Design a protein with these regions (language model features):
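Short alpha-helix boundary/capping and kink motifs at helix termini
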Residues: 178-221, 233
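Walker A/P-loop
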Residues: 14
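P-loop (Walker A) phosphate-binding loop of NTP-binding proteins
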Residues: 8
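Small-molecule kinase domains that catalyze NTP-dependent phosphoryl transfer to phosphate-bearing small molecules
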Residues: 118-169
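A short, basic-hydrophobic beta/loop patch
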Residues: 207-262
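ATP-dependent small-molecule kinase phosphotransfer cores
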Residues: 27, 31-90, 103-104, 115-118, ...
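Conserved phosphate-donor/acceptor-positioning beta-strand/loop module used by diverse small-molecule
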Residues: 92-129
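Hydrophobic anchor at the beta1->P-loop junction of P-loop NTPases
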Residues: 5
Length: 272
């Protein structure tokens, strides 16, 4: 089963990819890997290819076409495409998007040793730069491809790296890919920290349904399944199993957020 792996900046995709490679035997094809293969096929250096692509953004299609070709040629192989847009081009893949709370992403990249490539004055600076880069990237994708990389409905699985370990995430993705290969589906499943999902119903609401989550302005809200969400917050679970519902009507209420925080003695990661 091939996996198309996208996600937020600072979510830890590279670390998870390494575990999928070392533990589960997946080959990893990053954008850089594909670029090197394309440059080799063209008889030029990757530097020259990058220079050409910088001058002419329409040359992005060279990489896109290479991903399509690769996914066809290696259709029976275990491959992970670590690329923002692979979900749009790689055929017959399990499409995964990795979320992370923005403040946690900023903390990670600020404390990481990335040499002179990325430098940040503070965690706040890292947060602002990551948000700006992510939004700018997505604008570019919308302009070139007319798709929204942040739209959860493009993916089969949304997985959250805010609290779980990279090993837990890799295990969940490998299992998800196997399950999807055996029983394909078209909706969007979610494995997210219960501490990044805000309630829309009072604490103690008699709601025994499965958890359904929607996304509004990059914030997760619980549409259904508040009892289960509250129980997961109470026991400190790493993941809430949920289904994504696009454009669900909700009314954010900060008094509800405080009810849930007080009941389970925690704080939501994001302040809204």
């Amino acid at each position: 089963m091939q996996i198309a792996f996208s996600g937020r900046l600072g979510s830890g995709k590279s670390t998870v990819c390494a575990i999928l490679r070392d533990t589960y035997g997946y080959e990893i094809y990053s954008t850089g890997t594909v670029q090197r293969k394309v440059a080799e096929d063209m008889g030029i250096s990757t530097l020259e290819l990058n220079e050409r692509m910088t001058k002419d953004p329409t040359l992005d299609h060279i990489i896109d076409d290479a991903v399509v070709k690769l996914s066809r040629e290696k259709s029976g192989s275990q491959i992970v495409y670590d690329s923002r847009m692979a979900w749009h081009f790689a055929e017959n893949t399990f499409k995964v998007y990795m979320y992370v709370d923005p403040t946690i992403a900023a903390k990670r990249v600020f404390n990481a040793d990335r040499g002179d490539v990325e430098k940040y004055a503070s965690e706040e600076d890292a947060l602002n730069q990551l948000n700006a880069r992510g939004n700018e990237e997505n604008k570019r994708f919308k302009k070139i491809y007319n798709v929204d990389n942040f739209d959860y409905s493009n993916y089969h699985l949304i997985i959250d790296s805010t609290t779980p370990s990279p090993e837990q995430i890799a295990d969940a993705i490998a299992k998800g890919a196997k399950d999807f290969e055996e029983n394909p589906y078209t909706d969007t499943k979610m494995l997210v920290s219960p501490f990044v999902v805000f309630p829309t119903a009072p604490y103690g609401t008699d709601d025994e349904e499965e958890i359904v989550i929607t996304l509004v302005d990059s914030v997760h809200y619980c549409v259904k399944g508040h009892n289960k969400l509250a129980a997961l917050q109470l026991c400190g679970s790493a993941f809430a199993h949920a289904t994504f519902q696009k454009n669900a009507p909700i009314t954010p209420d900060k008094t509800l957020f405080k009810e849930y925080e007080k009941a389970a003695n925690f704080k939501f990661f994001t302040n809204i």
